[in-house]
Design a protein with these regions (language model features):
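Short, compositionally biased P/S/T/A/G/V-rich stretches that sit at domain boundaries
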Residues: 35-66, 142-172, 176-178
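Solvent-exposed loop/turn segments flanking beta-strands in beta-repeat/beta-sandwich domains
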Residues: 77-90, 178-199, 222
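Beta-strand-rich modules
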Residues: 217-235
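Active-site SXXK
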Residues: 288, 313, 331-356, 384, ...
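A short, well-structured edge-of-sheet supersecondary motif
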Residues: 292-324, 567-571
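Active-site-adjacent helix/loop patches that line small-molecule binding or acyl-intermediate pockets
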Residues: 362-365, 371-466, 489-503
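Active-site Gly/Thr loop motif
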Residues: 467-468, 516-571, 648-658, 666
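Peripheral terminal and inter-domain segments
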Residues: 601-706
């Protein structure tokens, strides 16, 4: 065990985390980043095809003139060196081939983007973009609607204004709305004085302000910023855009931290009823502390994009950071899997699928799978739901998502999955497998005759009032079941609250209560967690009580937590892709801030007094050995009350519920329970520590050494 920190019980957590989660890593597949057009949402088949996407845009530039902008982006799966290995680029418009070649295009390495800006507005119609590399070629099309003029953002409304000095962090940028007859999406761009982008948000509908990360701006340096306004949610969909001239600002040598101010979430179009934290009986001090740490970009909580809390059916907290917004369609990554589970329940309930015990191969009679044997014939829908089909997926962080990458590059994803060799007997071993979730979507499409997206919109999203989302399909037209969905955070909370209420939303039963109960049961062991039907299940400890938790878990820090005992739904969005242990941050936020803030929802825990002579028998030094390392905990008496500490760090009071049973709360592991154990001679020889540092309930023995 490697000691990364010296805090109360934390080294234990780190060791057990590596041992318990190392086999599957970080929950879900990495999906494209909306901020970079270089990331292709759907994988091309392998072979001679170059993966390419293209877009044509009508630009209203800051010089008040109009331009035609062409972007041609080469996908990640291109095998070659860019830009050199692209031999030719041709563009054909409504009136025929344009007089353009590769040498006319600029190349942006970060985005793998060949681009050009041509004076004049584009013609309406369809454009085809073709690239070649040796004998390989690829093409894409984009249709330009009738160009409209989006007004330029008014720099007179900008804050900070041109020439202004920033004195507070995180820096806050704001502007007024642009008036137009179409929905508009805004993006904040920031560059350094060397013309390098250092920050930009995604395109967000009706976003008029944004905080940028504190770390991007250096004291005493100058920067430039602007706002883009477009008529689409992402670069491939928009037709028209406008952007103001760059505004130069300076950062003061000495900066002060911006204070967090709580505001009750607004009620919007009968979306959510809201109330204040105080009205909900929540300790707002803990929430304020967490929000402030996120706001200033503290290392332990940096890159958190959004936090939403629903208590007793009311939205009581809604905060967004780093340029995100309530209208932002955020990547929810593998939270998508949990939604696919709901859709499977609806499909069964409505009779499209007879039973989850049906064999998977029966849905694909046109496929003759390789490596066919009795085990493969025995794979059922339930095995896919449990991540236990027994297939050799090689599809987790441990394998660097090798299986997922190979599937995305295959000519037929369903065939690829069904061809995989067997590694285990179906239903016996949890092994994280994105392809299993993809097959669930493929089965829904086969059984219903509808794309999974269309089925979801008809039978789930429409009933929840979810009208805006993105959920792409693969090259064969099958909705991607493992991830890549984008939802607004408020809509993520609807999914969670519907599950909390047993499949019911505002009095309407969307999916049966039986399915909700069954899909969230602990069917199979998954590391130190349990796994249901594409839902995770674990525990937290709050004031000596073990609290059941159910959650959807998406790569990068996307979570939908459901805690029935507290009538609480917690939603987190983030961009925690830089570290395979990213999930630790979110669980720590839950344990250290969110759960303690809601402890008033539970009846007070009864505490008892224990005789001082008994307490004295517990005093001493205890250790726990793991992987050649020793964790030491000292138990002491202070003011006639029992306390524990490790490595001279946090002193934690132990509250008695019985003569030998205690509980407490550490800032590092959250709530815990502790039981002293005596030998046959009545001597205390160890204590048992029960804790749930990342919602995995653990039991660790500490032996008394002196």
């Amino acid at each position: 065990m490697h000691r990364l920190k010296q805090r109360y019980f934390l080294p234990i957590i780190l060791a057990l985390l590596c041992a318990g989660l190392g086999f599957w890593g970080c929950a879900a597949s990495r999906t494209p980043d909306s901020e970079s057009p270089a990331k292709i949402e759907t994988a091309p088949p392998i072979g001679s095809i170059i993966p390419v996407r293209g877009a044509i845009t009508h630009l209203h530039e800051s010089d008040k003139k109009f331009y035609t902008v062409i972007d041609i982006v080469i996908g990640d799966h291109f095998q070659g060196t860019l830009p050199d290995d692209i031999d030719s680029i041709t563009v054909t418009g409504p009136q025929g081939k344009l007089a353009l070649g590769k040498r006319d295009f600029n190349y942006h390495e970060r985005f793998r983007d060949f681009w050009i800006s041509i004076p004049g507005a584009p013609e309406s119609g369809t454009y085809t973009f073709t690239v070649t590399s040796g004998k390989r070629s690829g093409s894409a099309t984009d249709t330009q609607s009738t160009p409209i003029t989006i007004p330029l953002p008014d720099i007179r409304t900008f804050s900070p204004a041109a020439g202004e000095t920033i004195t507070k962090i995180p820096p806050h940028f704001s502007w007024q709305a642009v008036e137009a007859d179409v929905p508009l999406y805004y993006r904040l761009d920031i560059k350094d004085m060397q013309d390098n982008y250092i920050f930009r948000t995604g395109y967000v509908k009706d976003m008029f302000s944004a905080h940028a990360p504190s770390s991007i701006l250096k004291p005493g340096q100058s920067y430039r910023w602007r706002v883009r306004v477009v008529d689409g949610a992402n670069w491939i969909e928009l037709d028209n855009r406008a952007q103001n001239q760059w505004q130069q600002i300076t950062v003061a040598q000495k900066l002060s931290e911006r204070e967090y101010t709580y505001r009750v979430p607004p009620e919007i179009n009968n979306d959510w009823q809201t109330s204040s934290l105080t009205e909900a009986g929540v300790d707002s001090e803990k929430i304020d502390e967490l929000m402030h740490r996120i706001l200033i970009g503290h290392d332990t909580v940096k890159n958190v994009h959004g936090v939403l809390l629903v208590k007793n059916g009311r939205l009581v907290l809604e905060e967004y950071f780093y340029g995100t917004h309530r209208n932002h369609l955020h990547p929810i990554q593998s939270d998508t899997k949990s939604i696919v589970s709901i859709l499977m329940g609806i499909a069964v309930e409505k009779g499209f699928i007879n039973s989850i015990e049906q064999p998977v191969l029966g849905f694909f009679p046109e496929i003759a799978p390789a490596n066919l044997n009795a085990d493969k014939r025995a794979i059922t829908i339930e095995h896919l739901l449990l991540m236990a089909p027994g297939l050799q997926c090689r599809d987790s962080y441990r394998y660097k998502w090798r299986g997922l990458s190979e599937m995305r590059q295959s000519a037929d994803w369903t065939q690829f999955m069904l061809d995989l060799p067997m590694a285990e007997t179906p239903g016996t071993q949890f092994e994280y497998c994105n392809g299993a979730s993809f097959l669930l979507s493929a089965i829904i499409q086969k059984a219903t005759g509808m794309k999974t997206l269309d089925f979801a919109e008809k039978h789930l999203f429409s009933h929840l009032g979810i009208t805006e989302l993105r959920w792409p399909a693969n090259p064969q037209g099958i909705t991607i079941g493992w991830g890549e969905m984008r939802l607004k955070p408020r809509d993520m909370a609807k999914i969670g609250y519907m599950m909390l209420k047993g499949g019911n939303w505002q009095g309407k039963q969307i999916v049966s209560r039986n399915w909700v109960n069954e899909s969230t049961q602990p069917h199979i062991k998954a590391g130190w967690y349990k796994y249901g039907y594409q839902w995770w299940r674990g525990n937290a400890i709050l004031d000596n009580r073990v609290i059941e938790a159910i959650w959807a878990w998406g790569h990068g820090g996307q979570f939908i937590f459901v805690l029935p005992a507290l009538d609480l739904v917690a939603v987190f969005t983030a961009k925690h892709y830089e570290n395979p242990g990213f999930s630790e941050r979110t669980f720590n936020m839950m344990n250290q801030y969110i759960l303690p803030a809601f402890k008033l929802s539970l009846p007070p825990q009864q505490k008892i007094s224990v005789d001082k002579k008994v307490l004295e028998t517990y005093v001493g030094t205890y250790n726990f050995e793991h992987d050649g390392q020793t964790e030491i905990v000292n138990i002491i008496l202070k003011d006639n009350r029992l306390h524990g500490y490790s490595n001279d760090e946090e002193l934690v009071e132990l509250h008695a519920t019985a003569e030998n049973r205690f509980f407490g709360r550490s800032k590092d592991i959250g709530g815990f329970k502790l039981q002293f154990v005596k030998d046959g001679n009545g001597e205390v020889f160890n204590f048992l520590l029960h804790f749930a540092p990342q919602f995995g309930l653990l039991r660790v023995p500490f032996d008394k050494v002196e």
